[in-house]
């Protein structure tokens, strides 16, 4: 029955079948052959659809790769959830009452945990062939542990008077002046307080023992006044026990020892400019420890999700690994849209804060629970989409073995000293030796300086990711501004990712690093002098150069310097330095610096450090690195580049299975041939065409001027003598040395018409000088034609 159906296929159906075959996904994965029963209904249904509808479906739907579509949708939802929450976490921690150092630790420790846990879970997934289970469990941990942070209750706010700069903050000593109504005296009291705070009542019991002196001025109306250093004045009850030990009279009379108890109650609140809001530090410490535990546990179990999805996506792509950026682009699109939408939504939501005390203006706190709700919904959608991923371990194993079989001969061809009949033991020893060679290569001055720049750029990016919005909020920036900044930075990164290889081929890897460091210097110093938060937008465009182009240049530079079998290790080291160690140190060390010096001063300091590193790096590259031709001709490879939030995704995990499909071709220089020589060999180019070589054009112009001057003096055939002279004349003539191939002069009959006498002299001198010039060894028939043309 199936044979009859195949036999009656029309030409149109054959064409449609061919299109379906061509539209098969180009992922390089060998699909298992499906039974013919599944293919037969599809052909029957196709024949039943009208032609116009078939054309529309073919143009819009048939060529869609379902596997890559799942990857695109997952990246969109995952990074939408990530972008809606994680950039705002430092600002959220600030609202909870944490210091910059605490916030930096909570953000920076994630990178170190991801660096350690992502490879661990990747090995577990490959070893037990449970990639989908590990992926789904990881995404579930993303939802649960991050939503737990949103239910943390903020610390209590207290309204306290500002600390005077002249008082001593550690030893609580208060100077109390009391003037009673019956008599006038001034007592200088040294008070050692023991304070007990509650929410609405602060009781201070002061045990005072000091000397009381009677002044001479009588009848002074006075009120009890209190100048405390710390504590709350409103609703305060103070019990003063005055134990006067001695009395020094100034006027006649004496004061005997007495014990007096004075109760002072004040209800007057200070002005708003003399009070400030502080958090209860004990509650802040408790909140910090709770969130730290949640972050450590949650990141350990959830860090492997993006690594696994990247690996599956690269398996779907197969030999078209350069199209990874097209899949990852949807994640950046979702990040920008989610960040902008959430930022606008938060600006219109506020929460009321209960303040312990009076006299302070309530702060405007935003409701960040919306962020956690949006994160939970989007990450749940990513979890649902992740259930559609297909893991083929048998295929991966077969391709891995094939890749090893092809890779070993490639290594043997590269190493001329190794024989082609090496044993597996020798091969493994060679691979270990090559790994140590890689370590030595990366520790050299040339590549070690590049790795240091990669680490420092990661340091700067981690600091900006954590404290840029923190600083903008200090300048009264809104979350809408944060969303606009996110959109600009992601558009800049995408543009830089897709055009970075052309920029590298144009100016080179090292110059791209120069530009990135210079842009970082300008960006950080500009941010440090901001007065209006919205003026930061022009500098957000530099995000693509300072992050994307730098990352692409570093990974391309190292990948082109190491052999293919060690490229995965080199990229892993670079990712660890840039994405893991660099960003983690930037967030944690930057938090300590902001805590001590402030955000503006820290931005300014890191900007100056970028300038110093730029100068040192340029000096090292100028003095210590040889300027070789290989470095100039090194081409940028289109290596898939992960964007900012990818947690150490080993992009080259499937390196072995792609080397046999798409081997790396070393760039070879073309044979050296000047442009002038190519023009001389081109018989179709007219003789009056300008040469591309400037010095040849200049000499040729001088020669033509000299020739025309000779024509004006003597109208006889003097123009042929310089073009076809003897060896002595040609060696002494600079024009003859400049134009070693004057064959093209024959292509212009109007300029090179020989006279009869010259033609006759040529026929006489050419046998005598057979080696004068290849152009003079012409046949007698050609000489006769030239002579005839002269008449």
Curated annotation (Swiss-Prot):
S-S pairs: none
Residues where Phosphothreonine is found: 10
InterPro entries: MFS_assoc_dom, MFS_MFSD6, MFS_trans_sf
Residues annotated with N-acetylalanine modification: 2
Chain positions covered by the region annotation Disordered: 22-47, 407-427, 662-687, 723-791
Protein's cellular compartments: Membrane
Biased composition (Polar residues): 750-768
Membrane-spanning segments: 73-93, 105-125, 132-152, 286-306, 335-355, 369-389, 450-470, 479-499, 507-527, 544-564, 579-599, 605-625
Compositional bias per record (Low complexity), positions renumbered to this chain: 37-47, 416-427, 782-791
Keywords: Acetylation, Membrane, Phosphoprotein, Transmembrane, Transmembrane helix
Bilayer topology: Multi-pass membrane protein
Any single GO CC term annotated in Swiss-Prot or TrEMBL for this entry: plasma membrane
Tissue: Widely expressed. Expression levels in peripheral blood mononuclear cells are highly variable between individuals, including no expression at all.
BP terms from Gene Ontology: antigen processing and presentation of exogenous peptide antigen via MHC class I
Subunit structure as annotated in this protein's UniProt entry: May interact with HLA-B62.
Family: Belongs to the major facilitator superfamily. MFSD6 family.
Protein name per the record: Major facilitator superfamily domain-containing protein 6
Lineage of source species: Eukaryota, Metazoa, Chordata, Craniata, Vertebrata
């Amino acid at each position: 029955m199936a044979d009859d159906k195949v036999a009656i296929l029309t030409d149109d159906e054959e064409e449609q079948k061919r299109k379906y075959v061509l539209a098969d996904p180009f992922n390089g994965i060998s699909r298992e052959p499906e039974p013919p029963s599944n293919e037969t209904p599809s052909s029957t249904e196709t024949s039943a659809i009208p032609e116009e509808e078939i054309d529309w479906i073919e143009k819009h739907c048939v060529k869609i790769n379902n596997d890559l579509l799942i990857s695109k949708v997952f990246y969109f939802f995952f990074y939408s959830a990530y972008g809606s929450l994680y950039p705002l976490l430092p600002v959220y921690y600030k609202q909870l009452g944490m210091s910059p150092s605490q916030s930096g630790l909570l953000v920076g420790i994630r990178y170190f945990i991801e660096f350690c846990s992502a490879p661990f879970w990747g090995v577990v997934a490959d070893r037990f062939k449970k990639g989908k289970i590990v992926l789904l469990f990881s995404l579930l941990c993303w939802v649960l542990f991050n939503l737990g942070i949103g239910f943390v209750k903020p610390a209590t706010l207290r309204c306290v008077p500002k600390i005077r700069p002249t008082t001593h903050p550690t030893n609580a000593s208060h100077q109390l002046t009391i003037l009673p109504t019956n008599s006038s005296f001034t007592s200088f009291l040294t008070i050692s307080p023991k304070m007990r705070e509650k929410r609405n009542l602060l009781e201070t019991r002061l045990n005072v023992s000091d000397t009381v002196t009677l002044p001479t001025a009588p009848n002074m109306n006075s009120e009890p006044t209190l100048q405390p250093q710390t504590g709350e004045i409103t609703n305060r009850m103070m019990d003063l026990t005055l134990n006067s030990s001695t009395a020094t009279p100034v006027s006649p009379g004496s004061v005997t020892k007495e014990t007096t108890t004075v109760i002072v109650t004040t209800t007057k609140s200070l002005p708003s400019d003399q009070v400030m809001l502080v958090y209860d530090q004990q509650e802040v410490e408790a909140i910090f420890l709770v969130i730290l535990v949640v972050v450590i546990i949650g990141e350990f179990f959830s860090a492997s999700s993006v690594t696994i999805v990247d690996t599956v996506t690269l398996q779907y792509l197969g030999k078209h690994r350069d199209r990874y950026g097209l899949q990852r682009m949807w994640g950046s699109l979702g990040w920008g849209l989610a960040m902008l939408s959430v930022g606008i939504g938060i600006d219109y939501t506020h929460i009321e804060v209960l303040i312990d005390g009076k006299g302070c203006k309530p702060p405007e706190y935003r409701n960040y629970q919306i962020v956690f709700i949006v994160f939970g919904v989007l990450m749940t959608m990513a979890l649902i989409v992740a259930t559609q991923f297909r893991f083929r371990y048998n295929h991966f194993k077969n391709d891995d073995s094939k890749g090893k079989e092809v890779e070993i001969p490639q290594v043997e061809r590269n190493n001329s000293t190794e024989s082609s009949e090496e044993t597996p033991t020798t091969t493994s020893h060679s691979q270990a030796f090559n790994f140590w060679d890689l370590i030595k290569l990366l520790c050299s001055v040339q590549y070690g300086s590049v790795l240091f720049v990669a680490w420092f750029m990661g340091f700067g990016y981690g600091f900006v990711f954590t404290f840029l919005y923190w600083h903008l909020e200090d300048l009264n920036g809104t979350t809408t501004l944060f969303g606009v900044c996110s959109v600009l930075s992601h558009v800049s990164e995408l543009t830089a990712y897709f055009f970075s290889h052309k920029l590298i081929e144009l100016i080179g890897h090292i110059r791209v690093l120069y530009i990135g460091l210079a842009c970082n210097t300008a960006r950080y110093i500009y941010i440090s002098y901001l007065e209006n938060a919205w003026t930061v937008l022009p500098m957000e465009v530099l995000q693509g150069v300072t992050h994307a182009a730098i990352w692409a240049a570093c990974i391309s530079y190292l990948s082109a310097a190491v052999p293919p079998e060690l490229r995965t290790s080199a990229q892993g080291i670079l990712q660890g330095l840039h994405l893991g160690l660099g960003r983690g140190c930037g967030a944690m060390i930057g938090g300590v610096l902001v805590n001590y010096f402030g955000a503006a001063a820290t931005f300014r300091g890191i900007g100056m450090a970028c300038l110093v590193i730029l100068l040192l790096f340029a000096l090292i590259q100028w003095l210590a690195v040889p300027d070789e031709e290989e470095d100039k001709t090194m081409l940028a490879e289109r290596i898939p580049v992960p964007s900012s939030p990818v947690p150490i995704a080993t992009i080259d995990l499937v390196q072995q299975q792609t080397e046999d499909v798409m081997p790396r071709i070393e760039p070879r220089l073309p044979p050296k041939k000047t442009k002038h020589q190519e023009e001389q060999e081109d018989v179709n180019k007219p003789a009056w065409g300008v040469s591309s070589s400037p010095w040849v054009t200049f000499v040729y112009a001088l020669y033509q001027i000299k020739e025309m001057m000779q024509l004006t003096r003597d109208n006889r055939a003097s123009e042929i003598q310089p073009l076809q002279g003897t060896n002595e004349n040609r060696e002494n003539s600079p024009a003859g040395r400049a134009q070693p191939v004057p064959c093209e002069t024959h292509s212009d009959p109007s300029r090179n018409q020989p006279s009869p006498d010259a033609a006759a002299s040529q026929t006489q001198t050419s046998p005598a000088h057979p080696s004068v010039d290849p152009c003079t060894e012409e046949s007698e028939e050609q000489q006769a034609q030239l002579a005839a043309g002269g008449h």
